[in-house]
Structure formats: C-alpha cells, structure tokens
UniProtKB/Swiss-Prot annotation:
Source organism: Rattus norvegicus
Subcellular location: Mitochondrion inner membrane
PROSITE patterns found in the cross-reference section: FRD_SDH_FAD_BINDING
Residues with the N6-acetyllysine modification: 171, 174, 242, 327, 415, 472, 477, 490, 509, 530, 542, 590, 600, 616, 625, 628, 639
Name of this protein: Succinate dehydrogenase [ubiquinone] flavoprotein subunit, mitochondrial
Pathway stated in the Swiss-Prot or TrEMBL entry: Carbohydrate metabolism; tricarboxylic acid cycle; fumarate from succinate (eukaryal route): step 1/1
Phosphotyrosine, modified sites: 207
Predominant location category: mitochondrion
Subunit-level organization: Component of complex II composed of four subunits: the flavoprotein (FP) SDHA, iron-sulfur protein (IP) SDHB, and a cytochrome b560 composed of SDHC and SDHD. Interacts with SDHAF2/SDH5; interaction is required for FAD attachment. Interacts with TRAP1. Interacts with LACC1.
Record-linked InterPro entries: FAD-dep_OxRdtase_2_FAD-bd, FAD/NAD-bd_sf, FRD_SDH_FAD_BS, Fum_R/Succ_DH_flav-like_C_sf, Fum_Rdtase/Succ_DH_flav-like_C, SdhA/FrdA/AprA, Succ_DH/fumarate_Rdtase_cat_sf, Succ_DH_flav_su_fwd
Cofactors that this protein relies on: FAD
Gene this protein is translated from: Sdha
UniProt function note: Flavoprotein (FP) subunit of succinate dehydrogenase (SDH) that is involved in complex II of the mitochondrial electron transport chain and is responsible for transferring electrons from succinate to ubiquinone (coenzyme Q). SDH also oxidizes malate to the non-canonical enol form of oxaloacetate, enol-oxaloacetate. Enol-oxaloacetate, which is a potent inhibitor of the succinate dehydrogenase activity, is further isomerized into keto-oxaloacetate. Can act as a tumor suppressor.
GO molecular function, one term: succinate dehydrogenase (quinone) activity
Length: 656
C-alpha cells in the first residue's frame, strides 16, 4: 500500500486544473497489497493517467464477474475487478425466479433431460457442447452456492425447494412438467449476488469500484487489459493484464420498455465491437411475457410455476390454445407471441384492450406470502393490485439478450477467420455479455443465473489451466488507449444541438417500434435507416457538465455510444435473418429455415447449402466511424463434449 499512497500523493500534488473541477484528485483503488500503480504522461497531459499491472482483470461485478474474480484469486492470481457500480448494485440482483439444476428433489430428474430442454428451447441454435457443459455442471454449481451460504427455500424435509418453470420437462419431453428451478422465494438473484459478494471478500481481489471501462487494450490481435475512467475523480487508468474477462451484462436499455437496470448498456459488447471483433446473434432479444403494464417491472415466471395463469378479457385461459401441453409454462417466446396475438385479435384487457391479466388470487394466500412475497409487494407498488384479490395487468417486455460476445464453452472469446473459429488471446467473456451459445434463439427461464456461475467459474478454470500466477504480463505501446482519451475529451466538451437523453429516447423508441415481438421486413428496413441516422446524430451531441468529478452526464453519453453500437447490430441482424426462430419472429417469413425440412423424414432430402438456410450464428461487425454494419455467419455446434455420455439432440419441430 505504500506504493499506492505515493501515487495518491503525487496525483494530489499535481493539482491539475480541469474545467469544472473543484477539488484535487483522489486516487482510489482496491485495498490489495499486491496492487501496483504509477503515473504516466504517455497518452495525456490534460488528464491524470495511472498504469496498473495484474495477472487478470475482470470487467463487471455481477454474478458472472464476481464468480470469475474470486475464482482467479482463489487460484493465486493477482486479480483486479473493475465495476461501474458497487457489486451488490449489479443487475443480477433483479433476477427473481431461480436457477435450474437437475437435483431431483421434487421428482426423479436427470441433467440430460435439462440438456434436451435447453437445446429445444434454443430452437436448435444453441451450441450443444456448451449446453452439455452447463447442464452437467448445474447440480454441483447449486450445491456450491448452498455451501457458500445461499439461503435456498426448502421443502418440509429440508432439501432445496424446486419449482416448475417454462420449457422444462422430464424424460426428454415425454414425462410431463419438471420441477427443476431452485429458488430463494422470488428473490433468487438478490440472494445469489449477495452470497457471491460475501464469498469474494474472503480473497485478496483488488476492486476498482465506480470505474467505467472505456476500451480494451489490444496489441497485435491480443487483449492486454482495459482502459477505464474513475468516475469519482476523473482520472484515467490503464489496467494491464495477461488475461481480461468481460462480464458487463446485457444491453436491454436499447429498448424503451424493458426490465433491465438503466446501467444495462452493453459496455463490454461495444468495447469488443470497437476492437474490430465480432458480436454474435444480437437479433435474438427475449421479451419476457409478464412485465407490469405501463411500468415494465418484471413479474417472475415463478408466478406461473406456482400455479398462476394468464387470462384474456373473456376470462379465458388462452394459453391452452397455443400450447396444449405446457400451457402457461411454455417457453417465453411462445407465451409472448401468444399474448401479443390475443391483444391483436381484440381479446386484450383494460379500456384500450392492450394487455392481458396474470391471475394469482386463486392460489392460497400463505403460498403467495411464502413463495412470492416480492411479487405481492411489486404488484401493489407499480400496479396498485392486491394479488390476493385482483389479477396483475401484464405485457411482454424486453428482458434478456441471447446474443453477445462469441465464446467457446471455456469462456474464450472467438473470432471467425476464413471459415474457422480462432481464439482471441487473453480475452474471455461470461454472463449475459457473452454468447457461448447456451441460449441460442431463446433462453429458458432460470438458465441465466446458471449461466453466470457456470461460465464465470469456467473462465477462471480456463485461465488457471493455461497460465500461472506471476507470469510476465505482455507490454503495451506507450500511447495505448490514446484514442479512448481523445473520445472522452470530445464528448466532455461536445457542444452540438442534441441532448444525450433526447437521442437515447429516440433510439429506444425506434427499437421498440421497429424490432418488437413480431417483425416484418419493411418495418425492419425502416428501422435500420432510422437507427443509422441516429448513430450519425452522435456527432451532434451536447453535454452540459464540463467537470470530471462525478460527471454523470459524461458517463451517460459514453453509455449511449455503447447502446448505439448494440442497437445497430441488433436491427441489421434482424433484417437480414429471413426466417422465424425462437425470439426472432418474422411475419413475412413465418417458418424456421433449416438445412433440412424437419417436419418430414430427412431420408431422401437434399441438404441445403450453408448460404441457403438459417440454422447458423450471425456475426456482426461495425465500422465505428461510419456506422456501417457487416454481417457474416458461422455454423452451430451440434456435437456434445462426449457423445457416448450425452447424445446430440437432432433438430425437430418445436412445440409445447
């Protein structure tokens, strides 16, 4: 800590007079004794720049980031964890329903059945090697959380309680509804995040709290760390590391109505894009069936898992018509589309007939109080509804991004060169920021928290396999990160005609109206033009705060740049994909287009060439100067990690 203190005194001694700054800079860093830092004048004389060196740096401190960070520290790596929020403010805290694992506490279960359901739920766009890894690791991951102290809800005999959730079955879809979702009432994400944060405090990890990651530090195709802004004092920090893990979450705030926190701005996704690397499958955006009408707040799928039902204005349990077997527990894309069709056909509820109802008041009050206490409170606050007496008005709301940074099942980031996958040295991703792809075209409920802990741990294990603590950290150029500082300075003094909030709202409303639950070519084309125009309007931004101390105006503008890159790739990918698959439902291309017609026996059929079918991953790139989007494609991985232990699930017609 003596070295850190010396740097702090040096920074304070310089008394840099930045416009709007009213106090000296305070250099804040994690309390690790292993932290090293020194002041650099290589890329800016206007902004204080501090260089650090670690074995590994994790960007993001939600469930995935924390699990990766303390996994590395536990293995002896000198680890930094950089986050724009205090860890327990991360969006993982908002997850309600639970975490899937085939524990078999309610009935016989098998992780291979979970594997089957996840592949089917992905509409056969998920990579089966990664799905194999995740579902096989699920039971041990939940037991690990229990050992960390996570207070799971319990059965009467003391085992972890498991509820029913959408798209989950027994015996490869032939044995009825599975009860596979482990939960802590309806506050599972809150409990998981606090459990992981508490566990992380056992280890010597350096936390850089309220630091905004600006860009990756890339050298010769390798990632060698990140450059970040300290929001507290405006200092710039280059964190050099042999390995970098991106765990920054999703980009739900590209849409007007969503369940995501305002901080879900796709920061990691955008950093990868600016580094010239691809993003994968961003057109697949999950609409959760039950957001509170008018507010967008999440009402967990656990409500339907506990016996809640969706009804229309005629009091009809309409899901029986769309999914005769699973009914209200069909997969999320199926339920969201069914609700939208009910509203379109005039059976919506309310004066405007523009929503449906989620009915819970037929359930015992004691069940609502013990299994769904948070929902009872949320419904009263945001809808004015007493769930023991009235139904909750609900509407599909943007909830999750299936796409993200392409990785393999070890968390290593991939690029696609000459038709082949290549690993990007030194770069990993996990959580919602990543696309492994375990969710494919549609994520099953309660697989997201599982994704976080399984692949956060996988990143740490993968690094421990290939590196050793104290390995030499590769050098970076003296001016590495210079462009990031220039961009920050440009935005800080931006004096155009458009407020950040105005441009952000225009983007969100455009995405909401042009790339919603149902999509059509002409509307998507119009959306592409509109979002491209809005991207161009970034040149006309006006920021008002010229200071550097807690400049939230500047941070929101940096976040808007990130959101725009995500929005561009989402809508261009959606316009190009001329089929319906999972969460991507085209009204002008209503069927799934595979290499074979799986509604018929494939014997005698000729396999479609790769260019003529859509069972493939979209790879998107953006020229950040012009906003031009370029698309490429890579094949889906159908083989599991061990065919003898877990057989591939061949594509089939998907019904519930």
């Amino acid at each position: 800590m003596a070295g850190v203190g010396a740097v702090s005194r040096l920074l304070r001694g310089r008394r840099l007079a930045l416009a709007g700054a009213t106090r000296g800079f305070h250099f804040s860093v994690g309390e690790s004794k292993k932290a090293s830092a020194k002041v650099s004048d290589a890329i800016s004389t206007q902004y204080p720049v501090v260089d650090h060196e670690f074995d590994a740096v994790v960007v993001g401190a939600g469930g995935a980031g924390l699990r990766a960070a303390f996994g590395l520290s536990e293995a002896g790596f000198n680890t930094a964890c950089l986050t724009k929020l205090f860890p327990t403010r991360s969006h993982t805290v908002a997850a309600q329903g639970g975490i899937n694992a085939a524990l078999g506490n309610m009935e016989e279960d098998n992780w291979r059945w979970h594997f089957y359901d996840t592949v089917k739920g992905s509409d056969w766009l998920g990579d089966q090697d990664a799905i194999h890894y995740m579902t096989e690791q699920a039971p041990a991951s939940v037991v690990e959380l229990e050992n960390y102290g996570m207070p799971f809800s319990r059965t009467e005999d003391g085992r972890i309680y498991q509820r029913a959730f959408g798209g989950q079955s027994l015996k490869f879809g032939k044995g009825g509804q599975a009860h596979r979702c482990c939960c802590v009432a309806d506050r599972t994400g809150h409990s998981l995040l606090h459990t992981l944060y508490g566990r992380s405090l056992r280890y010597d990890t350096s936390y850089f709290v309220e630091y905004f990651a600006l860009d990756l530090l890339m050298e010769n195709g390798e990632c060698r760390g990140v450059i970040a802004l300290c929001i507290e004092d405006g200092s710039i920090h280059r964190i050099r590391a042999k390995n970098t893990i991106i765990a920054t979450g999703g980009y739900g705030r590209t849409y007007f109505s969503c369940t995501s926190a305002h901080t879900s701005t796709g920061d990691g996704t955008a950093m990868v894009t600016r580094a010239g690397l691809p993003c994968q499958d961003l057109e697949f955006v999950q609409f959760h069936p039950t957001g509170i009408y008018g507010a967008g707040c999440l009402i967990t799928e656990g409500c339907r898992g506990e016996g809640g039902i969706l009804i229309n204005s005629q009091g009809e349990r309409f899901m029986e018509r769309y999914a005769p077997v699973a009914k209200d527990l069909a997969s999320r894309d199926v339920v969201s589309r069914s609700m939208t069709l009910e509203i379109r056909e005039g059976r919506g509820c309310g004066p405007e007939k523009d929503h449906v109802y989620l009915q819970l008041h037929h359930l015992p009050p004691e069940q609502l109080a013990t299994r769904l206490p948070g929902i009872s409170e949320t419904a009263m606050i945001f809808a004015g509804v007493d769930v023991t007496k009235e139904p909750i008005p609900v509407l599909p709301t943007v909830h999750y991004n299936m796409g993200g940074i392409p990785t393999n099942y070890k968390g290593q980031v991939l690029k696609h060169v000459n038709g082949q996958d290549q690993i990007v040295p030194g770069l990993y991703a996990c959580g919602e920021a990543a696309c492994a792809s375990v969710h494919g075209a549609n994520r099953l409920g309660a697989n997201s928290l599982l994704d976080l802990v399984v692949f956060g741990r996988a990143c740490a294990l993968s690094i421990a396999e290939s590196c050793r603590p104290g390995d030499k950290v590769p050098p970076i150029k003296a001016n590495a990160g210079e462009e990031s500082v220039m961009n920050l300075d440009k935005l800080r003094f931006a004096d155009g005609s458009v407020r950040t909030s105005e441009l952000r709202l225009s983007m969100q409303k455009s995405m909401q109206s042009h790339a919603a639950v149902f999509r059509v070519g002409s509307v998507l084309q119009e959306g592409c033009e509109k979002v491209s125009q809005l991207y161009g309007d970034l040149q006309h931004l006006k920021t008002f705060d010229r200071g550097m101390v807690w400049n939230t105006d500047l941070v929101e503008t940096l976040e808007l740049q990130n959101l725009m890159l995500c929005a561009l790739q989402t809508i261009y990918g959606a316009e190009a994909r001329k089929e319906s698959r999972g969460a991507h439902a085209r009204e002008d291309y209503k069927v799934r287009i595979d290499e074979y017609d799986y509604s018929k026996p494939i014997e005698g059929q000729q396999k479609k060439p790769f260019a003529e079918h859509w069972r493939k991953h979209t790879l998107s790139y953006v020229d950040t100067k012009t906003g031009k989007v370029t698309l490429d494609y890579r094949p889906v991985i159908d083989k599991t990690l061990n065919e003898a232990d877990c057989a591939t699930v061949p594509p089939a017609i998907r019904s519930y």
